[in-house]
Amino acid sequence: MTGMFDVSKKIDTFRTATARAVLRISSTTIHHIDNGNSPKGNIIEAAKISGTMAAKKTYDLIPYCHPIPIDYVKVDVSIGENQIEILVQVKSIWKTGVEMEALTAASIASLTIYDMLKPIDAYLSIESIRLIKKKGGINDFKESSWSKIKAAVLVASDTRSKQEDESGRIIIEKLKGIGCDIVEYVVIPDNKATIISELKRFSDDLKVDIVITTGGTGVGPHDFTPEATKEILEKELLGVAETIRAHGQRRTPLSMLSRGVVGLRGNTVIINLPGSVNAVLESLDCIFPGILHIFKMLQGHRHK
């Protein structure tokens, strides 16, 4: 299917991109510019204004670009020997990159200068428009390999259903997709003592690196997963649990009812996810791959 990419599952990250455009001009034209004799006025100010406007209007010009909240646009114009260089930097905190905004700004700024100088320079040309660099997005947080990470999945449910099976399968597929070794997958009753026993077995006996539970995080009479998890945790990771709920709350008002907790027992990361398929999908999109950086921290490495 063609058209816009669906970025609704992505999280907001800091994005930046820099684009460069170069116009080739004659030495005579440079003389006119230096003496303020450009027939249509100040080319530098016009390029800065048009480039800034173009960055903010990219989605109107390029049909499949997303409307992006632009936080910063900077257009620099420098005149050298027989050339004019335009350098554009764009910044945003959003789900998708700002490369097209930077390139569009550089393009329109160069076309503006072309329009203003063409009456006096028959050999004027736009030599190049290129993306110089870009940064941002979830890929910046991916590590080279997670093949040594051992994982376990625990489904807490009084009555095993297709939904629980599907939620567990989704978690397994996600973990396998990032190279984790699935040590065990269990479905157990939503019973506090049983959950505690299994979590201890995973962390203390099997020494798995990450345990993801699904189910039992609500406010029902048989929802005990958070209580069981808290009882055996040595350190809570409040920020992760808050991030999961905040991500979900932007998609459904029911996310605030989840009581899932996240934390460490020894070097084992334990993550409570809700039981519904949609909640599991949204939560996994939210925390991976960023959560995996914790294993470097546990080894004594600093943040990037």
Residue ranges and their predicted role:
Residues 172-236:
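N-terminal small/polar loop signature for handling phosphorylated ligands or for N-terminal nucleophile
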Residues 165-167, 223-227, 284-285:
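Short amphipathic alpha-helical segments
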Residues 115-122, 139-190, 194-196:
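Glycine-rich phosphate/diphosphate-binding loop of Rossmann-like nucleotide-binding domains
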Residues 60-66, 249:
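Active-site phosphate-binding and catalytic loops of NTP-dependent enzymes
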Residues 173, 177, 246, 289:
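Short, well-ordered alpha-helices that flank and scaffold nucleotide-derived cofactor binding pockets
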